[in-house]
Every structure is written in C-alpha cells, then in structure tokens.
C-alpha cells in the first residue's frame, strides 16, 4: 500500500514533526510505502525538506494541480492529509482520501475523518468522530546544553520551545523578569523563541537542526513553560518534556485545552502574572518517579499506529454523524465565556 503524507509546509513545527513520525512508523509497523508531499508555494526550509528526503520519497507541489499530478504519478492508494487550514482537502477519485484535523474545525469529508487529540475530538465534534493522537517518541538525550551556554549545574532552569512567536501571553516578559529579580538561582533557556529581554540569566538557544538536539535541550531544563495564548490542541512541545519525566508550567486558559489534559496537577498551572511568578519562585526540582512520563504513554508509537491503521487505512468509508442538537450554540457560548475569563486573567 502506497500512502501519501501531506501536512503542507515542512518546518520545525509540531505538524511537520507529527507527519514525520506518522510516515516513519507507518512504514516500520504497518508495512506501508510512505510518499511525502509538501507545499512549496512559499519559501522552502531546505534543511527540513532534506530531513524528510533522507528517509522517504519527498515531492514538492506549488498548487493543487501539481499535487494531483504527483498523486497520480506516484500511484498512491491512500491520500493522507494532516490538515491545518479551514478549506476542505480535495478528493481523488479511485483513491482513499483521509483527513486528520489539527485545529477546531468541523467539516467531515473524505473516506475517514479524525482529530489529533481526544480533547479536540470532544470539543469540535462532541466525540462523534475518532481521535488519532500525535506520536510522542522523542530520541533519548545525548547530554545537556548547560555548559555550552554557561548555565551553572546547580541552577534551576525553566525551558521553553515551540514556534518563535508562540510564547505570547502579554504578561510573560514582566513575570519572567520579576521572578529572575527575586530568585538568584533561576535561569531561563528559550529555544527558537523571539527575544524579549537581554537579562543575563535568559539564554536564547537558536533553532536546533534535529530532534536529538531538542532532546538535549529538554534534558538541560528542570521544568518546562508553556504560555501560548490560544492553548494547545495537542501540545507536542509539552509532551517532549513529559517524556523525559519533567513537569511543565502551563497557562490555564486558551481556546484549545489539551495541555490541561496533559498537565492535570493544579500546582503546575497558572492564570495570572502573579500566579506565574509564584510558581517560578516556589518550584524546586525533584525526581518525577515516572509520573509525568506516564501522561504520554498512550501516545507511544505502537498504540497510536494501531489506531491510525484502524481509522485511516482499513474498512469502507466511514459514516458522518451530525453534531448533537444545540451543540454549536452551547460551544459558542462557552467560547465567549472563556474569552472573557482569559482577558480577565491577562489583565489581573
């Protein structure tokens, strides 16, 4: 079976990481022949494309017509789309087309339709469509980066990585600077993060070329920090900390809320600027004893790929149940209340 894997652009973000993992484990565990398709209509990140091309046949398209031609030329049996935009993914007659929603859309189409987390499937579709979660399988760390960046061994290190512009709660710079001023052993290590301060104990780590480098970065930290205004529909960056049995401080707000399913301990959640400052001041490193690693055990390659095969590769086209009566009206009311709540927390 030849399966095309299309997630749009190939970069260092979570969608491309997930696409790579699905393609890799589909071949390893399910015996499929993966073919990676990627959007080259905008600037291409050559190093990221090379990472895929080293393991899979990888082909660029610049428009829908080129993508359709590639699917025909490559004799694709199943067209898999990790979908990040609102418009529907096109159908390809004679080929099974399956759609995997990354965001909170509800537009069932294709021969199979699913979401990237149990929380998202419930929030977007009342649980009437399945979840095929992202794989959490980072490589083991080879060491850590503290010495390389001049961070003392005895320091308490808070780490963050993700999209450069996604540490975007408005009060984050002030909260971090206040905590650094009050605690002399506290350091911040920020990977691939837009600079907001020149404090001597804030270390900016540039984008790393491979997943091993990210694992080394996580190993350098005692606790993670996630402060994304929109929340997380899955939260791979959070999961990479949990996989090394390290806790993560997470904002309790956001439209998307799977991060709260991953981190369910109230002492590692914050709402306001003062909450975060207090959390940074009171945190003391201690062994996780497997507690945090257990949170991501369901996302190991084997169980995820069993679900992937069952939902996307097997059986006839799936039924498309409707949402419950009144579901969207109730969801919109909840979202309005959440926006008001989040606005209050950001200004408190």
What are these regions (language model features)?
Residues 215, 238-243, 257-258:
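Short alpha-helical segment that forms part of, or immediately flanks, the ligand-binding pocket
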């Amino acid at each position: 079976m030849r399966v095309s894997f299309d997630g749009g652009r190939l970069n260092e973000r979570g969608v491309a990481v997930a696409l790579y993992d699905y393609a890799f484990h589909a071949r390893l565990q399910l015996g499929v022949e993966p073919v990676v398709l990627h959007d080259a209509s905008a600037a291409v990140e050559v190093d990221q494309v090379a990472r895929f091309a080293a393991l899979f046949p990888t082909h660029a398209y610049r428009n829908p017509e080129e993508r359709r031609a590639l699917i025909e030329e490559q004799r694709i049996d199943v067209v898999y789309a990790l979908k990040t935009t609102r418009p529907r993914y096109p159908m390809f007659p004679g080929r099974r087309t399956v759609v995997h929603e990354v965001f909170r859309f509800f537009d069932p189409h294709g021969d199979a339709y699913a979401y990237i987390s149990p929380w998202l499937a419930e929030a977007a579709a009342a649980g009437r469509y399945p979840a095929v979660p992202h794989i959490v399988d980072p490589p083991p760390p080879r060491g850590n980066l503290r010495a390389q960046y001049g961070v003392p061994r005895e320091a308490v290190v808070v780490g963050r990585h993700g999209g450069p512009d996604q540490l975007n709660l408005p009060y984050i710079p002030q909260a971090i600077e206040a905590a650094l001023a009050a605690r002399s052993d506290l350091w911040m290590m920020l990977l691939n993060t837009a600079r907001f301060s020149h404090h001597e104990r804030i270390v900016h780590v540039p984008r790393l070329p491979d997943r091993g480098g990210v694992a080394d970065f996580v190993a350098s930290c005692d606790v993670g920090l996630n402060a994304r205004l929109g929340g997380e529909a899955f939260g791979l960056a959070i999961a990479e900390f949990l996989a090394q049995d390290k806790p993560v401080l997470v904002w309790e707000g956001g439209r998307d809320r799977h991060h709260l399913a991953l981190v369910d301990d109230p002492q590692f959640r914050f709402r306001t600027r003062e909450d975060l400052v207090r959390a940074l001041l009171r945190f003391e490193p201690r062994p996780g004893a497997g507690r945090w690693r257990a949170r991501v055990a369901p996302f190991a390659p084997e169980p995820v790929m069993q679900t992937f095969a069952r939902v996307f590769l097997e059986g006839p086209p799936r039924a498309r149940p409707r949402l419950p009566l009144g579901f969207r009206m109730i969801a919109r009311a909840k979202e309005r209340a959440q926006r008001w709540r989040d606005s209050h927390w950001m200004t408190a």
